[in-house]
């Protein structure tokens, strides 16, 4: 191939965070998060200047819908709501801002034609989450830190 690969679309969200889970869980064989399922694609892309585009950034699972305002994710939605209120944006904007805050400089793919939803997603660019907020949201999604 003569044209270099400049982006890669991968499923990634605060709820579908396998791209970053494995290194954090690698010494814990009691959880499925310790299994390397992606061949270190995040590190590969960063080393080769390939931009990761997060597709389905608000989805959980493949066909289960969004995690935002979903009663199956009460802790995550509570945390998203607290940060959203403080920042003056929606929970959707905070969920996207969480992706944008990652040092890999990811892009989020907005798979919607709804103008209100697009505005919420664009509002994420107004928010720069602190490291503390980023990790608190990660923990609220049911993950843990070493």
Regions found by a protein language model. Name each.
Residues 1-146:
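Beta/alpha (TIM)-barrel catalytic core signal, keyed to glycine-rich beta->alpha loops juxtaposed to Asp/Glu
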